[in-house]
Amino acid sequence: MKLMVVSGNSGAGKSVALRVLEDLGYYCVDNLPVDLLAQFVESIQHSSQNVAVSVDIRNLPKDPSLLKNTLTELKKSHDVTVIFLDAEDKELIKRYSETRRLHPLSLIGEQCSLEQAVELEKSILCHFKEDADLVLDTTSKSIHDLSETLRSRILGRESKELVMVFESFGFKHGLPTDADYVFDVRFLPNPHWEPTLRPMTGLDKPVADYLEKHAEVIQLKEQIQHFLMTWLPALEKNNRSYLTVAIGCTGGQHRSVYITQQLGEYFKQQGQQVQIRHKTLERH
């Protein structure tokens, strides 16, 4: 029996995650109190069906160490994976404003604004997030995108095959929270300053041709490939189910997109399971 524990910030997509897990054959329990988690797992430990449990801000113990200790003990004798869903504050506020729903911290008596409730919840859950096996930033994801990402990550974990995720981003939009490695490519020649290339992206051939004329672009790409190829066997031996590599430039439109696409295609050719995402392009 596999146990998935799903948590995260309210509005980040926990209900979507549970629906995906249910579709994958998991028996799902929503908002189980933490002090009943160990007892519940013990009661179904001989079941052949995989189980998913969501942990909500409303049923967390006042002592955060209780949840950590409970999960530590469960992992000693069970196959446990903790998934944490996150999103930027402004996106969570937007989602609540659009649905006109009350934040859970407002429902349990906290006298605070929506913005304060989001900030307070993040501070309460920060330690749980640090201990999660899989952290997903859902800021720019539609329900469909989140469902597909969760499905591929969960199936990848179950098959014990390492999934390599390459994502481009713009530093002006902030660092991705789910990255294992971040490479800054802002020092490379910038197509933005070429008027004909400015409206294009790193996926367009004229931009690729421009970048490939510069030796430092090719050198950096090959050095990142070599670094990842060198340490990939060790990462796979460490029982990781995914590896997220983020490439950032200023706006996330040209240089980072090109390098990310090139890396993803290279590792696909090496037979790796690869996902490629362009965070800034997905915003538009």
Curated annotation (Swiss-Prot):
Keywords on record: ATP-binding, GTP-binding, Nucleotide-binding
One function term, GO molecular function aspect: ATP binding
Record-listed ATP binding positions: 8-15
InterPro entries referenced in this protein's UniProt entry, alphabetically: P-loop_NTPase, RapZ-like, RapZ-like_N, RapZ_C
Record's keyword annotation contains GTP-binding: yes
Source domain of life: Bacteria
Chain sites annotated for binding GTP: 56-59
Family: Belongs to the RapZ-like family.
Function statement: Displays ATPase and GTPase activities.
Protein name according to UniProt: Nucleotide-binding protein VSAL_I0495
Organism: Aliivibrio salmonicida (strain LFI1238) (Vibrio salmonicida (strain LFI1238))
